[in-house]
Amino acid sequence: MLADILRATTSICAAFQNGVKEILPVASLEEAREMKLKGFLVASEQDGKKLDWADFGNSAFNFTTEAIGGRTLVYCTTNGTRAIEIAKSAEKIAMGAFVNLSALAEWLVKENKNVVILCSGWKNKFCIEDSLFAGALTAKLLNYPGYTTCCDSAQASMDLWKVASVDLLSYLEKAAHRHRLKKLGLDDVIPYSFSTDTTRVVPVYENGVIRDLG
């Protein structure tokens, strides 16, 4: 499964919560722009900023029911959709965020398969928020029978989560992407992005399309 907490997987969950029909992730801005010319709704950003020709940026608050309900949305972001491209050989890729943490864990347990958590990071670099989510999800899965891990990165992410979860929003003041969004005036989505279990959707990428399987 994939985590891009700020902001792609959180925003994808919000889109399905508000009634989007399906999401078509694309890896390049050129492909996204071509889809726009074909009449699709397009959400696209670069380095956090909405592109002028796109209908939406990458904020969960963009995706209201009025804007996307019942529609197909093309999606291209700096980190999230590129991570999907990296992982697309997997049979299924679930989209994980704090907003669907429990629903996602339950879905993964029902799937009864090995779980790999891919943190999208920032331009192929480590980021705090995705690793915090990985720790939260790992800790939750380990409460279910049959789940174990001897992965150092999983253990480290759980340790990070244990420290940060005492006061998550305060801890996130350290996060580099938190400051990037603040400089762009886009940090209004921070509290929402770290709210736990506000939706039961489980967006899953399969055969080139993301649909809600929750």
What is each model feature region?
Residues F16-P25:
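Domain-level signal for Mg2+-assisted phosphodiester chemistry and nucleotide/NA-binding surfaces
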Residues Q46, V115-L118:
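A polyampholytic, Gly/Pro-enriched intrinsically disordered region
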Residues S120-D130:
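Phosphate/ribose-phosphate-bearing ligand recognition and processing surfaces
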Residues A94-A105:
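Short, acidic/small-residue loops that bind anionic groups at enzyme active sites
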